[in-house]
Amino acid sequence: MILVTNDDGYNSYGIRVLYRAAASIAESYIVAPDHGRSATGMSTTYNVPLRAFKFDYGYAISGFPADSVYMARYALYNDKKIDLIVSGINHGDNISLRSLYSSGTIGATMAGALIGIKGIAFSMSYNGISNEKIDLAEPYIKAIIENAMERFPDDVDILNVNFPGNLNRNTRILPARMSYNIFDDNIIKRLDPNGHEYYWFGNKRHERCPENCDYDVVYRKNSISITPITVKGYLDDLRSTEEFISFINVKELLG
């Protein structure tokens, strides 16, 4: 089966289109948050109970996108084999390493990859996004899922797919490297009506991204980007760490 999830909530338009595409290929079910959970990464619920609310073709749950994956795998559909996780279609792109670590859309596929299930995260740029544009993405999504079910790259855990907002029937699909960071951050301090300070976190995008990075493909080339991701975020070569440890003198500190 194909598990369909997202971080915009089970009733978002994007997940409906994604489910429609997935269900045309294989048995598919939705397990997704009961409301928007954007920018929650791989957050997981540990200290409060989770609740699941059944509807025609899946469940809405009270947790995060990653919880949706765990609930599907270990509780709601534990009698079925999940062959692929598809997440989205997110309202807004998910490009750069910032999104890799903060996006709930990608976070759901990361949770799946860590328990051995490959996944695809689908997102669309805010620029020009509409239900009609999301509908236009459906044949592309169907083609990508069909291909993934047959020949998902062995050395890849997740495919991160981003659609331009002004998608059309002639839009190309291009491979893209993930840009390092496309945001310049800032914190704005203000006063509430009672004179107490509060803060807004914000950022602006910059265009310092090399050719063929995800930003370049989506925004400069007006194309669909597909970025391969692996969840292995560590180095096998321990030599530099061994050298670092050699300079730690604990005995001297302990006296």
From Swiss-Prot:
Its EC number is 3.1.3.5. Pfam families: SurE (PF01975). A divalent metal cation binds at residues 7-8, 38, 90. GO terms for cellular component: cytoplasm. It catalyses: a ribonucleoside 5'-phosphate + H2O = a ribonucleoside + phosphate. GO terms for molecular function: 5'-nucleotidase activity; metal ion binding; nucleotide binding. Its cofactor is a divalent metal cation. Its main location: cytoplasm. Keywords: Cytoplasm, Hydrolase, Metal-binding, Nucleotide-binding. Binds 1 divalent metal cation per subunit. The keyword Hydrolase applies. PANTHER family: 5'-NUCLEOTIDASE SURE (PTHR30457), PHOSPHATASE, PUTATIVE (AFU_ORTHOLOGUE AFUA_4G01070)-RELATED (PTHR30457:SF0). This is 5'-nucleotidase SurE. It comes from Picrophilus torridus (strain ATCC 700027 / DSM 9790 / JCM 10055 / NBRC 100828 / KAW 2/3). The lineage of its organism: Archaea, Methanobacteriati, Thermoplasmatota, Thermoplasmata, Thermoplasmatales. The gene is surE.
